[in-house]
Amino acid sequence: MRSAQVYRWQIPMDAGVVLRDRRLKTRDGLYVCLREGEREGWGEISPLPGFSQENWEEAQSVLLAWVNNWLAGDCELPQMPSVAFGVSCALAELTDTLPQAANYRAAPLCNGDPDDLILKLADMPGEKVAKVKVGLYEAVRDGMVVNLLLEAIPDLHLRLDANRAWTPLKGQQFAKYVNPDYRHRIAFLEEPCKTRDDSRAFARETGIAIAWDESLREPDFAFVAEEGVRAVVIKPTLTGSLEKVREQVQAAHALGLTAVISSSIESSLGLTQLARIAAWLTPDTIPGLDTLDLMQAQQVRRWPGSPLPLVDADVQEQLL
């Protein structure tokens, strides 16, 4: 006997969360809970404004239609990426095919005063890997901050993300202020320039390795080994089903590329599932999941060690 619930939710964000020049005041999304006999599976559907093709209203319509079909015995996954991901997670939990083991290590997202960051990062236990957003301020300032962090902490490796913010000139301005002796400790820089060709040229000219992120979701993208390309950053909410995520990870690994499972600012429920996916598909790589502190609450499942209050599903708006 099958049954299902769908919930709509909204979480207030901390002030100052900006995505592509848009302030994100709340994170909006949906949960689906599927039950079959004694088994249960949860999934999160939370399109990311400015990044997802769909908004949450469109996702809601597709999700409700899919759930009704599933209740009638049809299991074909929807095509919409955020819905396909959430539904496939719920089905994987239902069938016990998503392993419970999780990688809760996260590359901390660094912002704020560089002196404070140095103290925080110096005290990090184990492998020191952190993420810095660049491209929000002047490229010269970004270069100086990155250089300062690498100089102050000799065993630090940085993942940088420019979100295609730079022209070739801006990229060169950034690199000019990063000591060539430190550049090998930039694990990768995600999508530095507005075009892939400019990003490839940036890698060749600076010796700073790059990673593809947005490119993975473009129709002409193909997995190929290229000089200067070290990694791919996979955001499952923007990608689609678990099977598609797995295919992309396998394609990257086959070329010797690092694959990083990364957050699209999911709630704690989605983040804990991403931590499980990372442990399953990319066990040797620290995932990019340090986004929970951007929110003011956790929902349904706790992220270990988070002090944020937990909100249960039964206080959310139930749609089904």
Swiss-Prot record:
What's the protein called, per UniProt?
o-succinylbenzoate synthase
Q: Which HAMAP family match?
A: MenC_1
Q: What does this protein do?
A: Converts 2-succinyl-6-hydroxy-2,4-cyclohexadiene-1-carboxylate (SHCHC) to 2-succinylbenzoate (OSB).
Domain of life, per UniProt, equals: Bacteria
Gene Ontology biological process: menaquinone biosynthetic process
Please give the Gene Ontology molecular function terms for this protein: magnesium ion binding; O-succinylbenzoate synthase activity
In terms of SMART domains, this protein maps to: MR_MLE
Listed under catalytic activity are: (1R,6R)-6-hydroxy-2-succinyl-cyclohexa-2,4-diene-1-carboxylate = 2-succinylbenzoate + H2O
Report the sequence similarity comment from the record: Belongs to the mandelate racemase/muconate lactonizing enzyme family. MenC type 1 subfamily.
Chain ranges passing through the membrane? none
**Which keywords does the record carry?**
Lyase, Magnesium, Menaquinone biosynthesis, Metal-binding
This protein's pathway reads: Quinol/quinone metabolism; 1,4-dihydroxy-2-naphthoate biosynthesis; 1,4-dihydroxy-2-naphthoate from chorismate: step 4/7; Quinol/quinone metabolism; menaquinone biosynthesis
User: According to the UniProt record, which cysteines are disulfide-bonded?
Assistant: none
Instruction: Tell me the CDD domains matching this sequence.
Output: OSBS
| Entry-linked InterPro entries | Enolase-like_C_sf, Enolase-like_N, Enolase_C-like, Mandelate_racemase_C, OSB_synthase_MenC1, OSBS_N
**Cofactor dependence:** a divalent metal cation
What Enzyme Commission number does this protein have? 4.2.1.113
Q: Locate the active site.
A: 133 (proton donor), 235 (proton acceptor)
State the organism named in the record: Shigella flexneri
Pfam families assigned: MenC_N, MR_MLE_C
Q: What residues bind Mg(2+), as annotated? A: 161, 190, 213
